[in-house]
Each structure stands twice: as C-alpha cells, then as structure tokens.
C-alpha cells in the first residue's frame, strides 16, 4: 500500500551555517557546569556568557560586530561569581538580566551602539535568593516583570521598576528547578525539576494548577515549555537513558498526548519554540545537530521534519526572536551556536521561488511593545502579546532608558496597591520621536508605492507604443 506523505510547508526547511567571516571569533565561552543556553539574542545584540577571572562576565556584541573579538573588548562584569543565565527584555532591546552563582540577579542597560567600556554597575541588583541563581526569564507581555529561580528551590517574581520581590514561591519544589517557562500571556508558568515532576503553576494565586510525577523516568535533567495552545512540551530521559520528548495537556496529565524516544546521547535537549509556525527545535548540549519538529492537531501530533548537522559540538545556543529575522530571504529561524572559541550563526530558511512577502510563513508576531504595566499584572490582569506585521521588515525603534525607583522603606502600605515608575513611560504618554519616525516611514512607503504604480503605468504605455510601432513598421 502506497504511503501518503503528510503535507507541510515546513517539510523542506533548510539549515545553513554562515561563512567564517560572519562568525564571532576568539570568544572564551564559559565552562561552568550548568545546563543553560549561555547565549541570548535580540534584533540588536548577541550576548554570550564567557570565562572570566575574579567573578562572572558576559559579552554583549552588536550583531554586525563579526570577526575576531579582541581580548580587551569590554564586558558586562558586575557579578562576583560565574554568570549562569542571561535573558534580554522582550520590551526593550537594550535591557538584559543575568543570574549568577553569587546569589543575585542583576539588570543592565546596554548603550544603544554597544559597549565602549566594561560595564560594572547594573541598573538594579535583585537580592532574595539564598543559593545560586540559574534561571532568569522576563514576562512575555507585562513590562518590568522578571522571574528568577535558584538552587534554593525558590521562584521569585520581581517588579524591576521598583526592585521589589512581589511573589516568592519557596515551598512548591522539593528539589532543584531545571527550568521555568511562561505561557503565551504570562498568566501561568510551567517548571521541570530534579524530583522528576512537571508542574503548572499560577504564580499570582501561588497554587499548583496541574502536576505530573515522573514525566520522564530517567535521572538526567528535564525541560518543560508552554506551547501557544496551552499544552506543555517536555524533553527528558527514559529509565534506560534514552532521550525522550513528550506532549502533555495540563487539564489531564495522566498520560502524554505523544511520547517519542530519540537516541541514547546524554546531552540535555534544549527546546526552542516558534509559536507562529508551531515548530520546535531541539538542540542537545554536546550534540552537533539541531532536530526540528512540527506540532499539529493530528496524530501523532509531534511530526519530525529534519535535522541540521554539523561537525562541531555545541556548548550553548542562542535563538533570535521572529522580529529579528530577514523576511526577504524566507528565514524562519536563526540560531547562534556556541563552540569552544566562537559563536556561529545558523540560518533556517524555507526555499520559495517568489520574491513576494510570504504571508503563510510570517503571520503577525509578538512585537516589542508591552501589553500591560507591571502593577496591572500583579493586580491580576492578563493580556496577549501585542502583534506586529513583518511585511515591511522590522525596524528597531529607540528604546527608553531603564529607570528604577526604590520605595521608601518606612512606607508600610501594601505593595500590591502602590504605583511605581517603570522602565518605560506608561503607554498613555506618547513617545513623540517614535510617532514622528513612524509618520516618516509611512510617507516613504507611500512614496515607494506611488513610484511603483508610475513605473507599472509607464511599462504598459511603452508596451502599447511598441506594439503600435511594430504595426507601422509592418
């Protein structure tokens, strides 16, 4: 019987490493024993955790700063212990958070054009963990809300605008937390921990909504992330040390929707998820490949697409947000693969013959504008990401400076009702420069359209005149 091949526009996703001159060379990537990605990327900068004497440090390079990186290049170096995790703010491309073995979280403001001097003073230091902080994750839709998780088995959610810890989940995990993931609107988090449990938690109600014991039975680390439809995707190991991936419905976590066994490598599988295309990319630490799968509503739900393979193993991996991709090249993902001494971008494309904008590859995607202010989220409001179109390419706007306003310690009013100054001016205040830039951009786009229309009309006219000339000549 002839087998029917499943139709998918992503069956031919093609991975390609960039040329050597477009890599970031001579970087001493961190050797610390921790299963984070060691790299964070946005449309302006790539940040990489590096080896540093006398404390912890990471590099922040403008994307165009390729080639050999000088040993004296400025670093972000305020931590007194190794940096374990970094995460760019989704609402401000110049703000990055870092977690360290020194038990602190620091939030940094990077100058618009990158560093010219090493940065030692963070905008704010967040102190609340009693052991090293291995996870930092910004809220996807609320401005200034940052989550951190430490080896004290506690999750703290901060209002960065005031430097306050407003939620402390310190009694939900009996063992080390491997990772934490926000859902699409930031109302829930899911966690994977060393006790082999996957938990879905409502952080504001401080209660566990769903829980699965022994999601994967192996002893090695697991990962759990939320998908756009609310399901949870996990990676882990079987009792026989085979790597597994699984899909779960939080409303019924007795049995997985899908469970696949992959291979017997021992590297932790780091999942990177694109909610616009429903593709999950799995990058194993120590692997030399990236496997990718499409998640659909039809059995077997998790469909293997392809594998990008290279020669060198990866020490870590950065993943570019959708708004940083080149839509003209039909690029659907860009990874920043960390080698021992360099960072190598890898571009994933869907080959298309047409030069037109591919609407089916690029639905409206999460933009840089926050949907909520911090105090709105802490008061119980939820909002989906504010979407933008990539049809004309994404042009980064000017970011506002991060400002932190400390509360008066003597002020004893409940924190939940207090108003606070935030990283950016509230939405109601219009950024004049930004509006002017948008108006100019609209004018330019209208002018281009007008020129295109004129050219089309001229082409038609020339064609008619040529036909008339041909008749006369005949």
From Swiss-Prot:
<dbReference type="GO" id="GO:0016600">
    <property type="term" value="C:flotillin complex"/>
</dbReference>
<dbReference type="Pfam" id="PF08953">
    <property type="entry name" value="DUF1899"/>
</dbReference>
<feature type="modified residue" description="N6-acetyllysine">
    <location>
        <position position="446"/>
    </location>
</feature>
<dbReference type="GO" id="GO:0051895">
    <property type="term" value="P:negative regulation of focal adhesion assembly"/>
</dbReference>
<dbReference type="GO" id="GO:0006909">
    <property type="term" value="P:phagocytosis"/>
</dbReference>
<dbReference type="GO" id="GO:0032587">
    <property type="term" value="C:ruffle membrane"/>
</dbReference>
<keyword id="KW-1003">Cell membrane</keyword>
<dbReference type="InterPro" id="IPR001680">
    <property type="entry name" value="WD40_rpt"/>
</dbReference>
<dbReference type="GO" id="GO:0005925">
    <property type="term" value="C:focal adhesion"/>
</dbReference>
<dbReference type="GO" id="GO:1900027">
    <property type="term" value="P:regulation of ruffle assembly"/>
</dbReference>
<dbReference type="GO" id="GO:0001932">
    <property type="term" value="P:regulation of protein phosphorylation"/>
</dbReference>
<feature type="coiled-coil region">
    <location>
        <begin position="436"/>
        <end position="474"/>
    </location>
</feature>
<feature type="repeat" description="WD 4">
    <location>
        <begin position="172"/>
        <end position="202"/>
    </location>
</feature>
<feature type="repeat" description="WD 1">
    <location>
        <begin position="25"/>
        <end position="70"/>
    </location>
</feature>
<dbReference type="GO" id="GO:0140285">
    <property type="term" value="P:endosome fission"/>
</dbReference>
<dbReference type="GO" id="GO:0045184">
    <property type="term" value="P:establishment of protein localization"/>
</dbReference>
<dbReference type="GO" id="GO:0045202">
    <property type="term" value="C:synapse"/>
</dbReference>
<dbReference type="GO" id="GO:0090630">
    <property type="term" value="P:activation of GTPase activity"/>
</dbReference>
<dbReference type="GO" id="GO:0010633">
    <property type="term" value="P:negative regulation of epithelial cell migration"/>
</dbReference>
<dbReference type="GO" id="GO:2000394">
    <property type="term" value="P:positive regulation of lamellipodium morphogenesis"/>
</dbReference>
<dbReference type="GO" id="GO:0042383">
    <property type="term" value="C:sarcolemma"/>
</dbReference>
<dbReference type="GO" id="GO:0007015">
    <property type="term" value="P:actin filament organization"/>
</dbReference>
<keyword id="KW-0967">Endosome</keyword>
<dbReference type="GO" id="GO:0001933">
    <property type="term" value="P:negative regulation of protein phosphorylation"/>
</dbReference>
<keyword id="KW-0966">Cell projection</keyword>
<keyword id="KW-0677">Repeat</keyword>
<dbReference type="GO" id="GO:0005938">
    <property type="term" value="C:cell cortex"/>
</dbReference>
<comment type="subunit">
    <text>Binds F-actin. Interacts with RCC2. Interacts preferentially with nucleotide-free and GDP-bound RAC1. Interacts with VIM (via head domain). Isoform 1 and isoform 2 appear as homotrimers, while isoform 3 seems to exist as monomers. Interacts with MICAL2; this interaction recruits MICAL2 to the actin filaments.</text>
</comment>
<dbReference type="Pfam" id="PF16300">
    <property type="entry name" value="WD40_4"/>
</dbReference>
<comment type="similarity">
    <text>Belongs to the WD repeat coronin family.</text>
</comment>
<dbReference type="GO" id="GO:0044387">
    <property type="term" value="P:negative regulation of protein kinase activity by regulation of protein phosphorylation"/>
</dbReference>
<dbReference type="InterPro" id="IPR015505">
    <property type="entry name" value="Coronin"/>
</dbReference>
<dbReference type="GO" id="GO:0001755">
    <property type="term" value="P:neural crest cell migration"/>
</dbReference>
<dbReference type="GO" id="GO:0051893">
    <property type="term" value="P:regulation of focal adhesion assembly"/>
</dbReference>
<dbReference type="GO" id="GO:0022038">
    <property type="term" value="P:corpus callosum development"/>
</dbReference>
<dbReference type="InterPro" id="IPR036322">
    <property type="entry name" value="WD40_repeat_dom_sf"/>
</dbReference>
<keyword id="KW-0770">Synapse</keyword>
<feature type="repeat" description="WD 6">
    <location>
        <begin position="263"/>
        <end position="303"/>
    </location>
</feature>
<keyword id="KW-0853">WD repeat</keyword>
<dbReference type="GO" id="GO:0010762">
    <property type="term" value="P:regulation of fibroblast migration"/>
</dbReference>
<keyword id="KW-0175">Coiled coil</keyword>
<dbReference type="GO" id="GO:0051015">
    <property type="term" value="F:actin filament binding"/>
</dbReference>
